[in-house]
A protein has these predicted regions:
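A membrane-cytosol interface segment of integral membrane proteins
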Residues: 140-189
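Hydrophobic alpha-helical transmembrane segments
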Residues: 12-21, 161-167, 194-195, 218-224, ...
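Membrane-embedded catalytic scaffold of the fatty acid hydroxylase/desaturase
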Residues: 1-150
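Substrate-recognition/cap regions that form aromatic- and gly/pro-loop-enriched pockets
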Residues: 208-267
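Helix N-terminus capping/helix-initiation residues
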Residues: 37, 152, 172-173, 211-212, ...
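Short, charged cytosolic
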Residues: 15-24, 175-200
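Membrane interfacial helix-start motif at the N-side
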Residues: 36-48, 199-218
Length: 267
């Protein structure tokens, strides 16, 4: 029962994260990739724990124990890993009930007919019940409508949120509020009103070509940092909180530096 309830709440959060600008700015990093593979499943937003919290609190109020809740959320997340692939086709009757790679490819597509569809985590029945289901038809074009060109993971998480607040401040008044809580396509009348979703051009992809030495250097650095992160995770129980914070900051700085190198920025 808890598994089904958690999946329903996940659906509600996920749907809201595509229809409320502030939540979308926090979630958008998961959709920025113009490829669709298992690595996309690992492209998780910094702010997800904050945005999911208000949705999951009612489950605690129902008396579900923390252990059961955390285990259920973990299983829900693990299930969603394998559906981020183009290698698995249609799965017949399974697709009537379960979320599958085909259903989730639709969710990541920016084709106009695929925008804001198939928000399910595990059970696609939520989309069927609430009118947000669309079967896979034409080949999806992946990414975001506005596009994202950059390898800096820190900027990918923070820039959309900063841009949204700057836009709200520029519009001011009630339009500022609507900018934050309205859907992504919303525009004030002075800017032409709600904008239709453009038809994407699959030939327009971000295709960077950083110098080979930079790629090799960043790859080696990534392996070393990953090893360091693994050691920290296993040893964190024995580390003072200040040391954990310092190591976390160093790892984040490292991630930002990779992005700067691969984007060939002067700093």
């Amino acid at each position: 029962g808890t598994f089904v309830l958690v999946d329903l709440v996940y659906y509600l959060w996920h749907r809201a994260s595509h229809r409320v600008n502030l939540l979308w700015a926090a979630h958008i990093v998961h959709h920025q990739s113009e490829d669709y593979n298992l690595a996309v499943a690992l492209r998780q937003a910094f702010f997800t724990p904050l945005t999911t919290l208000p949705f999951y609190i009612p489950i605690a109020l129902l008396g579900v124990s923390p252990l059961v809740f955390l285990t259920t959320v973990a299983l829900n997340t693990v299930y969603q890993f394998w559906i981020h692939t183009r290698l698995v086709g249609r799965l017949g009757p399974v697709e009537w009930v379960m979320n599958t790679p085909s259903h989730h490819r639709v969710h990541h597509g920016i084709n106009p007919e695929y925008i804001d569809r198939n928000h399910a985590g595990v059970f696609i029945v939520w989309d069927r019940l609430f009118g947000t289901f669309t079967p896979e038809g034409q080949e999806p074009v992946y990414g975001t409508v506005q596009g994202h060109h950059g390898a800096n993971a820190i900027a990918a998480n923070l820039q959309p949120v900063a841009d949204l607040f700057r836009l709200a401040a520029r519009r001011g008044g009630l339009d500022a509020v609507k900018t934050l809580i309205g859907p992504p396509e919303w525009r004030p009348a002075s800017e032409g009103g709600p904008q239709p979703v453009p038809v994407p051009n699959p030939g327009l992809r971000w295709d960077p070509h950083p110098p080979t030495p930079i790629v090799v250097y960043s790859g080696v650095w990534m392996l070393l940092a990953s090893l360091a992160l693994t050691i920290v995770l296993f040893a964190q129980a024995d580390l003072p909180l200040a040391h954990q914070g310092a190591l976390a900051f160093l790892l984040l700085w490292t991630v930002g530096a990779w992005g700067g190198l691969l984007d060939e920025r002067p700093w």
